[in-house]
Swiss-Prot record:
The active site is at E314 (proton donor). Its EC number is 3.2.1.52. It comes from the Eukaryota. InterPro entries: Beta_hexosaminidase_sua/sub, Glyco_hydro_20_cat, Glycoside_hydrolase_SF, Hex-like_dom2, HEX_eukaryotic_N. GO terms for biological process: carbohydrate metabolic process; glycosaminoglycan metabolic process; N-glycan processing. GO terms for molecular function: beta-N-acetylhexosaminidase activity. Residues 1-21 form the signal peptide. It holds the Pfam family Glyco_hydro_20. Responsible for the degradation of GM2 gangliosides, and a variety of other molecules containing terminal N-acetyl hexosamines. One of its GO terms (cellular component) is membrane. This is Beta-hexosaminidase subunit A2.
Amino acid sequence: MINKFLTIFLIFSIVIIKVLSQSSNEQPLNVVPYPQEVTMIGCNIPLSVGSISIKSNIESTILSISISRYQSLFFPFVSNNVLKDSSSNIELSLIIASDDETLELGIDESYFLLVNQDTYQIKANTIYGAMRGLETFKQMVVYDVVENSYSLTCAEVVDYPTYQWRGLLVDNARHFLPKNMVLHIIDSMGYNKFNTMHWHLIDTVAFPVESKTYPKLTEALLGPGAIITHDDILEVVAYAKTYGIRVIPEFDVPGHSASWGVGYPELLSNCPGYPQSSIPLDCSNPYTYSFLENFFSEIAPLFQDSYFHTGGDELVIDCWANDTSIQKWMKTNNYNTSDAFQYFEDQLDVILKSINRTKIAWNDVLQHGVKFDKETTLVQTWTNINDLRDVLAAGYKTITSFFFYLDRQSPTGNHYHYEWQDTWEDFYASDPRLNITSNAENILGGEATMFGEQVSTVNWDARVWPRAIGISERLWSATEINNITLALPRIGQFSCDMSRRGISSGPLFPDFCSLPDDLSFSFKPVYQLSKDEIKLILKKK
């Protein structure tokens, strides 16, 4: 009995020591997001360029692409000082329980990773768990800039995400992002173990999505050629899947709808005196719903995921009260504007059910008195923590965004930072379930949002990274992994690693980030001065 008690006590003590060491005292493994459990083994294995091979026990097209990708990322600097002998060649073994490539919310992303002098192994239940393990393994391959050499850190890792929904909103409407830029964004998301891309495809200013059913929708373009074709969507969805990233489309209705009306003005309400940007879809017109049904039926099959975001935020609802035909319709049905909004959302539910999709809507729809089916609707909360509590109290499942607005210079309520880059600390400290005492289990996760009023291809990376690295860790790692001082050097190093992979992620503190030649020397002046020209120019003051 005493021996049994001592055994239990020792196991309990070891667990406590492990948790405390990771949360309070040290984070010895230089990995982002930080894993759930880490045991350092105390060795570093020297490597030479090209010395890592990967072997899997299953066949999977998606996994093969992921393996090829990481094979190309292990050694960004092609020359090093490590001898190319057989002793530094290692074979990483992937042992995966299932070859099922189905990707959906709640997919198992856990993995076990072991690196020591004799074993190089990742075990996972799914190919997507193996992918997460490959990213961790990649970060354990360390480049020493002084010695110009590589080594592999020995450790045992048990890892899984804290939140099942770890998203990033990509705005393709306010500034057009061409397909290759979207693929580049997916690369950066995959490196950070994000698993959901919320694709905000249209807005008031533009409708850049091709429709073969309603071709005049793309009369509302930002510029010539600024259009996302069906083939583009299919490629984006497929490419994202090779990172274990689900793609959720958002078509925001009934507000933010001016772009719908450029090609099809009969869809819009008639509200004299209201700016065009404030005019919503006509909730009283049966044509509105047949149009949406036909359009959504065309678009939904391009996306594999069961979730479909219908927006609903920032509706200028008084417009409906000032449209004479809508007034007449509301009077006939004994509706007020809240009833009209409820009717609109109910019709959306019928449409989404017919195409086998689950609704996501912004939380301010609820603030108009609208009620959703709690079993078939996911609410995205973007306003504040009190509204989050209201959403939870009403029994809805939710994902949170108000913590993670990347388009703002500082998160809401925090104005003490002098450097906007330092707002990563606010994001890092913002656990979605923090200060939530009721129904916290209904918070599925969170989304960083990069609305694009002032963001385009030229500055997207710099506005998102490295700040979103902190968000990725907050959504993946254990709640106890929250020490900003310990996180800073890891995130700084990983930001450099992302730069070496072609993502323009900047520094968080003064440091030196060596880049491969193809990245370091990619900047060239429009006119290259010769040595003689330099001397001639400097000859006179």
